[in-house]
């Protein structure tokens, strides 16, 4: 060995290069199903009854400028939606529409895929709410309902919730899916998993009770992952602090269950998380060049979320980090992290991480986030592709969302402007369609009229409990 080292130093022998192991793949549940099996429209891919979904009939968006999210140039086209799917994209002038279709003229407007936000906290408590009121489940749910409206009126048709109060994001997901409340699709992570003294365990106590799962030791980290899986998680969210064994256990368990892992961490914890095989790193927190190189080599993705820190810098004049993290940074440093990741070829998604009452600023924060992408070298169309197709891929939903191509779910945004030229035009929301349902018209949430259900007869008298006579 000593001779080999001496020879290598002399340039005579090349020592083998130690490389990280290949990224451990996420288990694909679809491989065990027949190709005709219909599955749930989320990363869980649960088999569901093969019945038509979405509203009856068909919808035609006629004469608009189509930005389809694939990276192709914007063109004039007509979009055909049948029930909850895009079935055709017709060239300008074509009129072969389905019989009885509802036709909406969108001439001069831009048709594009609904936007996706990869980093939300739907029920994070408001300023001024104390620990008792802020942690009340009913209040948390109502906050979530309100914020879903802010999102969908901003053209966002899918949100990934990466840390909220217990069951709240799961119930919100159910009610949106059933069209009982207006909003975007919800992809919840469940509780944030961290170690004692980690992110959310120290600080000002602003995290909701039930939003954090403290785990100690590798076996407990595995158990915490399984707990979120049982709740119905679409992704697993972890945060520093963690040991090498703990993060490896979490990733191993999540990938076995078919779920990706995203990590909120900083400095050397990023190196540790990437080496363990996490799928994504959140935020622009400090990291070394070697960590960025390792992310690129392992295919680790990133959701930079620059906009919340911009808000903090603008409102408070600076950021000092939480007591559990011990670092400082600036707008320039954050932007440089984004620039370095882009230059390294890391796949980047778009998320806002809006907390407290910042949701009320929408859609401006989302547009600001996209502007940071442009600032580091993306073209405007490339930034919009990141917000649609790339975000869908990072959700593990690239086969169903993110582009307006035949076979994809009909999540559509219609804008009064040219957002592929000027990002500020994203604020001019005209119509939003989610799962084939029109949920925003003329820029406002549209709630269909309640259609009374015919009560069966005879039925019980509400006061006496006796059956009423037939009329």
Where do the PLM segments sit?
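Metal-associated gating/positioning segment near the N- to mid-region
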Residues: 109-175, 196-199, 203-206, 273-276
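His/Asp/Glu-enriched, well-ordered alpha-helical/loop segment
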Residues: 135, 332-418
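Divalent metal-dependent hydrolysis catalytic cores, especially in the metallo-beta-lactamase
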Residues: 144-169, 184-191, 231-241, 260, ...
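Histidine/acidic-residue-rich catalytic or RNA/ligand-binding cores of hydrolases
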Residues: 126-129, 169, 271-277, 308-321, ...
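N-terminal pre-domain segments of enzymes
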Residues: 22-56, 457-471
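Histidine-rich, glycine-flanked metal-binding segment
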Residues: 43-57, 66, 70-112
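Active-site core of metal-dependent hydrolases
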Residues: 238-333, 354-358, 377-379, 393-395, ...
């Amino acid at each position: 060995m000593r001779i080999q080292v001496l020879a290598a130093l002399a340039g005579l022998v090349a020592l083998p290069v130690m490389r990280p192991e290949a990224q451990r793949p996420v288990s694909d549940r679809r491989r065990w199903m027949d190709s005709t099996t219909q599955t749930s429209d989320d990363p869980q891919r649960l088999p569901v009854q093969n019945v038509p979904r979405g509203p009856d009939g068909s919808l035609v968006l006629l004469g608009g400028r189509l930005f389809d999210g694939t990276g192709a140039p914007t063109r004039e086209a007509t979009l055909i939606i049948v029930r909850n799917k895009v079935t055709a994209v017709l060239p300008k002038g074509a009129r072969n529409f389905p019989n009885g279709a509802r036709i909406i003229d969108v001439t001069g407007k831009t048709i594009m895929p609904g936007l996706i936000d990869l980093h939300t906290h739907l029920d994070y408590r408001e300023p001024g709410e104390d620990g008792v009121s802020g942690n009340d489940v009913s209040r948390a749910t109502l906050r979530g309902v309100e914020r879903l409206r802010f999102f969908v009126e901003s053209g966002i048709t899918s949100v990934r919730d990466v840390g909220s109060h217990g069951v709240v994001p799961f119930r919100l997901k159910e009610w949106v899916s059933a069209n009982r409340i207006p909003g975007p699709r919800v992809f919840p992570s469940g509780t944030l998993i961290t170690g004692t003294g980690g992110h959310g365990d120290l600080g000002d106590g602003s995290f909701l009770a039930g939003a954090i799962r403290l785990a100690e030791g590798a076996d407990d980290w595995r158990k915490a992952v399984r707990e979120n899986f049982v709740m119905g998680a679409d992704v697993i969210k972890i945060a520093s602090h963690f040991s090498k064994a703990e993060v490896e256990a979490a990733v191993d368990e999540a990938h076995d269950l078919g779920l990706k892992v995203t990590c909120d961490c900083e400095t050397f914890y990023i190196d540790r998380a990437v080496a363990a095989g996490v799928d994504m790193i959140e935020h622009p927190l400090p990291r070394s060049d070697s960590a960025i190189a390792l992310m690129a080599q392992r295919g680790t993705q990133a959701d930079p979320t620059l906009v919340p820190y911009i808000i903090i810098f603008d409102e408070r004049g600076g950021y000092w980090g939480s007591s559990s993290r011990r670092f400082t940074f600036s707008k320039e440093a954050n932007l440089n992290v984004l620039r370095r990741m882009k230059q390294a070829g890391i796949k980047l998604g778009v998320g806002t991480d809006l907390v407290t009452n910042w949701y009320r600023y929408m859609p401006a924060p989302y547009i600001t986030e996209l502007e940071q992408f442009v600032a580091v070298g993306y073209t405007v169309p490339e930034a919009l592709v990141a917000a649609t197709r790339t975000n869908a891929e990072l959700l593990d939903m690239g086969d169903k969302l993110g582009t307006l191509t035949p076979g994809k779910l009909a999540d559509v945004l219609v804008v009064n402007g040219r957002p592929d030229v000027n990002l500020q035009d994203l604020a001019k929301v005209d119509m939003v369609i989610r799962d084939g349902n029109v949920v925003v018209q003329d820029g406002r949430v549209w709630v269909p009229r309640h259609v009374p259900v015919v009560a069966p007869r005879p039925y019980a008298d509400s006061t006496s409990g006796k059956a009423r006579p037939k009329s």
